[in-house]
Amino acid sequence: MRIVSLLPSATEIVYALGLGNDLAGVTYECDYPADARSKPVVVETALPQDRPLSAGETDALVAEFMDRGEPIYSLDKDLIRRIQPDLILAQDLCRVCAVPSGQVTDALAELGCSSEVISLDPNTLDEILEGILTVGRATGTEPKATELVADLRRRVDAVRRTALRLPSIGTLALEWSDPPFAGGHWIPGMVETAGGTNLLSIAKEPSRRITWPAVAEAMPEVIVFMPCGYYLEDAENELESLFALPYLAETPAARGRAVFAVDASSYFSRPGPRILDGLEILAWAIHPESFPEPPRDRITRVIA
């Protein structure tokens, strides 16, 4: 089977199901596991890659593309034609995060390809796990997918059982800084499962633009900074600069030294198998006395 993955989380699912050798095309962002970096790249971004962009610059550039009605991502149609994939894994959840499946089907029609396209669009932890089962059924690896999902569900249940015995802590999952956004889709449910009271966003809905005064008014006891697509070092650097804002510095979370930066790209932004690592990271950030401390390359306490 020839599989093309148009989002990093799908690439991780493919490898988790033992299908790495069947993966014939990926995106420029597919970097896990390491073998994914050796695969042909069928998706590139129009955003500059020659220098790091600030959160504000990224937001402004994305807004410009949206205003002009231009796609942020481009498909290498010639490469897809040569691959002739049997299965393409895509998404419709976020036009900013990856190629929309509509853009994919238009390209396939233009190319005359009859590839099956599966759109993975989870809004909850459970839907993320269901997506793994969907890929398993489509690729003939349903037993492996069922085994993997059963293990992931056991980990969810273990976190939930412990968290239910603990007080709920007001928690802000901050997904972007300039402008500030509170994490949406599956993130609010993760916060609740991990023993927090999710603040300023709504479960199963897109990330929500907020204001810094609203952050102060919400009085979060824990803040977890998980900027979409950022790895830990970049998230740390961005978060340290935010302490110059009085709204953040005056929150109970900042006063109580409960402000954290995380490796968002690996454990929160991608709805794949490693999202369970993200849940366990969140649980420790919210209730450090009751959950094992994660490895230091996953989360850092940031102090003003």
Residue locations for each model-derived region?
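N-terminal ligand-binding lobe of clamshell/alpha-beta domains
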Residues: 1-304
